């Protein structure tokens, strides 16, 4: 048992599904109890032999400033030489989601075209950069000039497409003259509908999320994809990152190496204080945030 002080909490799209009683892959939040999610915390008191005062830990824990919990749901961070919020982004669950979804399901090959939606976000930005490391041509879809410019000028994507522009369909077509071999799906809705028109034979589609429909599931009506999957002999597969837990350690080491080498860059949107949680959620679901959304609760 140990007592910890929360430093950062992670705000993630999947949490929207925990705010309803709809059938989902994760239990809904309980009324009258604190949210729980991924946090970075500092140990301030401990009787556990492996955890000392001052240790920095990460885990799935209640959103409280100070809390006494068991050690079964936490891990020490491997290093404090990097910004701690990275353990909620590229060195945490979003990085694992990007890594395994792309490499284990998407299986990109050198020279192929990889398209990723929500490309400036915590998962999408890492997907695109890993695809570049693997020698692929990468096209990112994002909303607004600032995000699209970030993809091409900061992250070295080969092309960026703004889904908010009226000419989105044509711009996307121009960006993928040789078709699409891997589409990493984070958004769903009309964006996915347009991408599916350009799939190559044997395309792979890892489905990580469908954030466009999280607030309005009743409106999520679009073209039927089955015919395209058959015609293109394409593979579309949903996944939960937990299924790859046995390989988390290896993936973490590789991601950390790429970060240290400057091959993966990150963008973090930081709000300060628990009172900013509602606005952070709104920003996340409307696309107004930039990169990984975290809340800073206290200083180290």
Predicted regions and their residues:
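Mid-domain Rossmann-like dinucleotide-binding core that forms the NAD(H)/NADP(H) cofactor-binding site
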Residues: 88-166
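Short, glycine/polar-rich helix-capping loops at beta-to-alpha or helix-loop-helix junctions
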Residues: 64-65, 143-153, 168, 220-226
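Glycine-rich beta-strand-centered segment in the early N-terminal region that forms part
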Residues: 3-11, 19-63
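C-terminal capping/lid region of NAD(P)-dependent oxidoreductase domains
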Residues: 261-270, 278-300
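N-terminal Rossmann-like NAD(P) cofactor-binding module of classical short-chain dehydrogenase/reductase
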Residues: 58, 115, 161, 183-184
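NAD(P)H dinucleotide-binding glycine-rich loop of Rossmann-like/cofactor-binding domains
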Residues: 35-42, 53-118
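Glycine-rich phosphate-binding loop and adjacent beta-alpha segment
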Residues: 190-264, 297-300
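Short amphipathic alpha-helix with an adjacent loop that forms part of the alpha/beta core around
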Residues: 167-178
């Amino acid at each position: 048992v140990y007592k910890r002080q929360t430093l950062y909490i992670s705000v993630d799209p999947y949490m929207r599904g925990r705010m309803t009683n709809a059938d989902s892959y994760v239990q809904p939040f309980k009324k009258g109890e604190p949210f729980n999610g991924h946090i970075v915390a500092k140990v301030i008191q401990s009787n556990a032999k492996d955890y000392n005062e001052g240790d920095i830990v990460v885990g799935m824990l209640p959103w409280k400033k100070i809390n006494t919990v068991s050690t079964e749901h936490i891990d020490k961070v491997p290093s404090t030489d990097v910004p701690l919020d990275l353990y909620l982004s590229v060195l945490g669950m979003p990085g694992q989601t990007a890594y395994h979804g792309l490499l284990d399901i998407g299986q990109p090959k050198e020279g192929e075209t990889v398209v990723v939606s929500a490309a400036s976000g915590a998962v999408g930005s890492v997907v695109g950069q890993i695809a570049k490391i693997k020698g692929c041509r990468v096209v990112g879809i994002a909303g607004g000039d600032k995000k699209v410019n970030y993809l091409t000028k900061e992250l070295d994507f080969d092309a960026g497409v703004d889904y908010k522009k009226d000419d989105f369909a044509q711009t996307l077509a121009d960006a993928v003259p040789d078709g699409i071999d891997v589409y990493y799906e984070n958004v769903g809705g009309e964006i996915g509908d347009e991408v599916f028109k350009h799939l190559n034979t044997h395309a792979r589609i890892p489905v990580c999320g469908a954030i466009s429909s999280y607030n309005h599931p009743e409106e999520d009506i679009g073209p039927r994809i089955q015919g395209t999957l058959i015609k293109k002999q394409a593979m579309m597969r949903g996944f939960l990152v937990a299924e790859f837990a046995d390989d988390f350690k290896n993936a973490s080491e590789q991601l950390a190496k790429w970060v240290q080498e400057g091959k993966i860059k990150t963008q973090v949107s930081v709000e300060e204080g628990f009172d900013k949680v509602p606005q952070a959620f709104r920003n996340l679901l409307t696309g107004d945030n930039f990169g990984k959304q975290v809340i800073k609760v206290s200083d180290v």
